[in-house]
Amino acid sequence: MFTGLPALSYEQQQQAVERIQQLMAEGMSSGQAIGMVAAEIRENHTGGHVAVMFDEDEEDYMGDNNHDEEEPEEE
């Protein structure tokens, strides 16, 4: 899957980490904290975006040209 993620500066990344840590210290689960901060970033971000491809989708992206031939099963 290709997606455009907000391009964050080092300082913005640090602020996000600190916000996640703060939410976790207040009792929120890590998954909830990450999701909340990610949503806040997506909602408020006005800068550029970075195109990314997730590893699990690499096979779909590569198409059939790069697959190894399947070996026949022994009977």
Swiss-Prot record:
> Which superkingdom does the taxonomy of this entry point to?
Bacteria
- Show the Pfam families listed in the entry: UPF0181
InterPro entries the UniProt entry points to: UPF0181
Bilayer-crossing regions: none
**What family classification does the UniProt entry report for this protein?**
Belongs to the UPF0181 family.
Q: What is this protein called?
A: UPF0181 protein ETA_15280
